[in-house]
Amino acid sequence: METNSSAAFSPLPVPTTFIVNVIHAHPGKQEEAFAIIQDVVHYVAERKEGFLWSTLAKSTDGQTVVNIEAIQAAGNVNEFFSDPVFAEKFRKLDDVSKSEFHTYTVGDLVLPKRVAAL
């Protein structure tokens, strides 16, 4: 199912909710942890209306993976975890990592204040 992305830049703070997963991979398991959270995020992106966008990144020291994910509202978290397929996919992280999961709401957007030289 193809959909149009609703992701867009806004120069003002918008009441967006973010999920931040910090995944502390077991030694030598960063790539596997990345693949698991990538699978989870793609599953959500393809099926859940509350999903807006995600950025997945690996630390350069090989120890962590982070998922910064924008969702429409904090209630989407319960919606995602109530899906048994999602929950099973997410639990696979326990085999290769210890992870933290936090929900945030935007409080400020800081942009550069420098004036470009001509």
What kind of region is each of these model predictions?
Residues 17-24, 52-84, 116-117:
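Short, well-ordered beta-strand segments in beta-rich or mixed alpha/beta enzyme
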Residues 37-41:
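Short amphipathic alpha-helical/adjacent loop interface patches that line ligand
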Residues 8-20:
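An N-terminal domain-start capping segment
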Residues 107-118:
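Short, low-order "capping/linker" segments at domain edges
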Residues 24-35:
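Short, surface-exposed ligand-recognition loops at beta-strand->loop->(often short) alpha-helix junctions
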Residues 1-2, 118:
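Eukaryotic N-terminal targeting leaders
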Residues 2, 43-53, 70-105:
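An amphipathic, aromatic/His-enriched active-site/gating alpha helix that lines ligand/cofactor pockets
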Residues 4-11, 54-56:
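Short beta-strand/turn micro-motifs at beta-sheet edges
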